[in-house]
Curated annotation (Swiss-Prot):
One of its GO terms (molecular function) is ATP binding. SUPFAM superfamilies: Fic-like (SSF140931). InterPro entries: Fido, Fido-like_dom_sf, Fido_containing, HTH_17, SinI_DNA-bd. It catalyses: L-tyrosyl-[protein] + ATP = O-(5'-adenylyl)-L-tyrosyl-[protein] + diphosphate; L-threonyl-[protein] + ATP = 3-O-(5'-adenylyl)-L-threonyl-[protein] + diphosphate. This is Probable protein adenylyltransferase aq_aa38. Its EC number is 2.7.7.108. It is an enzyme of class 2 (transferase). Probable adenylyltransferase that mediates the addition of adenosine 5'-monophosphate (AMP) to specific residues of target proteins. Keywords: ATP-binding, Nucleotide-binding, Nucleotidyltransferase, Plasmid, Transferase. Belongs to the fic family. It holds the Pfam family Fic.
Amino acid sequence: MTYQNGVEVLLEEFLDYLTKEETICSLEIEKLKVSIDELEKETDEPRVLQGINYFRTAKEVYQLSRKAYETKEEVVSEALILWIYENLWKGFNVPKGYRKSDMVIFGAKFSPPPPYVVPNLIRTIVNWLRNEKTIDVVKKSIIFHTLFEVIHPFPDGNGRVGRILLNAILVENGLLNVAFRNREKYISALREAEEGAIVVVEKLSRGRKIDYSSITETVEYYGNLNVFDELIRTEMMHSLKVYSNIKQVFLTPEEAAKLLGLKNKDYVRVLIHRGKLKAVKEEGKWKIPLSEVVKNFEHKLKGEEFKLANNLFKGKLSPS
């Protein structure tokens, strides 16, 4: 068994595998099937080329996001969004840039805003992303994703662009990109979460000024983000479980807290001291095996909630 430290190991060594899996799952959401082997081909067959374009585009974006994680920079920008769209449709006769006409989405609860407001809306949500510092990264990625999908800025491929951006936000903040393996669960989670985004986009489209904190509060108030949050963490833990069977990686309390969705590292220390999370201490610092983090998350999904962490959050316990 090989032992290594830190989430950055996962980002570096597991990225190719995860991005291939993500590509297959992301296209299956749109009922387009490609195989892992086909992603390595050179072809102009439209079905396969869409998969190749997604894989190559996503991988390059996540490599940029990984570097941004190391340098504490921000990778998501309007220029990146336009670049992703253009590269997803490389080799196809698809218009560049934002859509130039109104759009109707079959089965949606909303109508995307008129094309003339799209550029300003995209700049607004990018600025929101850069200025929002009060919520955890998974919730942040969900809010951005729902806002982007409601804006629906492009003639086609909005779901693909949006999922790459969601994952770029996760990777930029030290987490892994996720593959949504169940189409129905993804669509259901998106529908539950998007209610607040619909309210925000409608207000912004009418010229209303909304500050960044109000955007967050509105999306959280009207939309149910919890289902989407749990789906992302479940998919991430699925991937981590596969990886932990190959290689043993130790995480810091901060990294473990981020993966588990806990408020801060003190919650992790409480779980360690109470024997709920196995860890080792070296040179005065706790190191938690990735496999233990996965195990605890699985217990949580089965209904064995993190009662100690919740009690700490309510002020009933103090960290050791």
